[in-house]
Design a protein with these regions (language model features):
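Flexible, glycine/threonine- and acidic-rich loop/arm segments that mediate assembly and lattice contacts
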Residues: 1-321
């Protein structure tokens, strides 16, 4: 049906205001399950050091009445270290861009700072998860922290051709070592239970199982030992609260989206208080020198992973995602 004669409609109108919602919708994931769950610590040098120790195994102990005391052997602590890594995000906005009226935000620089801050934390989570050996650094090469997988030497399970765990701190070089790649396999409850037992026997008290999303779906099929609630009143910074009830205690099963990006085929069994994020320079926002009609801001953090005792943790290698 045609319009009546001389109809004036929106197709001819000049000066209609643009209809642009004054809200920006962003659903990109920003959660950082490991970084948000572990404690913070203070680093005072680019080479962040700490000590680890252990107890002797239990043994028979009976002393003859009236006998002279026999001195026990003493063992020295182990001194280990990781290097701080500088991470940043830099924003450059023209003076005009800062002045114009932009939809969805009152201040373009403030909006970009908030956005880049979240991205910086995601990069930190990536650094914990992606296999990365520690690097001393030089005037031409950045210092790098040794990631979680490069520290765990005692408790773990690798694919058929992977053999014994090869990672861990190398006292001779002062650097962390890489894991050995094995045959890819699907996660099973037997694999999980085996590593949990190894950690328990080594003295660990696991409370967190971090997995890629697809592996989380498989773990959820371990119906006999999985519940969908957490400790009453506990406040956590990650969404999932599924709990795997092992023979040695309850362990929260936490899906990690960033794990899917690394393609490392790893899952971590962690005792949260036995690792920390150690900050040499905490998060800061620095206005850089003005060189023209623009504003330049740097978001910066310098930090490292403090693996307080690798025997408290476990790793599942060569797990299909």
């Amino acid at each position: 049906m045609a319009q009546p004669s001389n109809m004036f409609d929106t197709f001819e109108t000049v000066g209609l205001r643009e209809d642009l919602a004054d809200v920006i919708y962003n659903i990109a994931p920003e959660d950082t399950p490991i970084l948000s769950a572990i404690p913070r610590a203070k680093a005072t040098s680019t080479k962040h050091e700490w000590q680890t120790d252990t107890l002797a195994d239990a043994a028979a102990n009976a002393v003859i009445e009236g006998d002279d005391a026999t001195t026990d052997a003493l063992a020295a602590t182990a001194r280990v270290h990781n290097f701080t890594q500088i991470m940043d995000k830099v924003i450059l906005l023209s003076g005009t861009q800062s002045a114009v009226d932009a939809a969805g935000r009152a201040d373009e620089m403030a909006y970009q700072i908030a956005k880049k801050s979240k991205e910086l934390k995601k990069d930190m989570e990536f650094a914990l998860i992606k296999e990365n050996l520690s690097v001393v650094g030089t005037a031409t090469a950045a210092r790098e922290l040794g990631s979680i997988s490069t520290w765990i030497a005692t408790n773990g399970s690798a694919g058929a051709s992977g053999g014994a765990l090869s990672a861990g701190f190398n006292a001779a070089t002062g650097l962390t070592r890489a894991t050995a790649s094995g045959t890819d396999r699907n996660i099973t409850e037997d694999i999980l239970k085996s590593v949990i037992k190894d950690v328990y026997e080594a003295g660990g008290d696991l409370d967190m199982f971090v997995v890629p999303p697809s592996v989380k779906q498989t773990v959820s099929t371990f119906n006999a030992n999985t519940t969908r609630f957490g400790p009453a009143g506990e406040k956590v910074e990650y969404a999932a609260i599924d709990v795997y009830s092992s023979d040695f205690g309850d362990i929260q099963v936490v899906p990690n989206r960033i794990m899917a990006l690394t393609n490392e085929k790893m899952c971590f069994l962690l005792q949260r208080d036995m690792l920390a994020a150690a900050y040499l320079r905490d998060f800061s926002i620095n206005e850089l020198a003005k060189t023209g009609d623009s504003e330049r801001v740097q978001l910066l953090v310098e930090w490292t992973l403090e693996m307080r005792n690798e025997k408290a943790h476990g790793i599942l290698l060569d797990i299909n995602q």
